[in-house]
Amino acid sequence: MVKLQKLLDGGYEFFTGVPDSGLKPFIDEIIESGVKHIIATNEGQAIGIAVGAELVGKKSCVYLQNSGLGNIINPLTSLCIPYDIHPLLVIGHRHTLLQHKIMGEVDDDLLKLIGYTNYIIVRGDNNV
């Protein structure tokens, strides 16, 4: 699991994303810490919020589950990559349930294909 303190030590000071049960311990850490944090209604919105924070000098992190990757492809390719704005993506990996199987097989390859490299895929027992 990703530890909030490591990200804070790395200069990350703003967090946004869509709640995910697999990332619950990480999200709970964010909420309990009191750092700047906005819960987004969808993954694309979270990217937009993070870009806004980056534009005012806040190193940002977006959390989501990999089933939401489809919602961030356009914001990444039309906003983040062309303008060299790369918030960290913390992605909960889901891959066993039918509705998560396809994205669970291609999540890493999809991000590599579009050239986005600032991400962590969190695999584990909680991310079924």
Where are these regions (language model features)?
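Thiamine diphosphate
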Residues: M1-V128
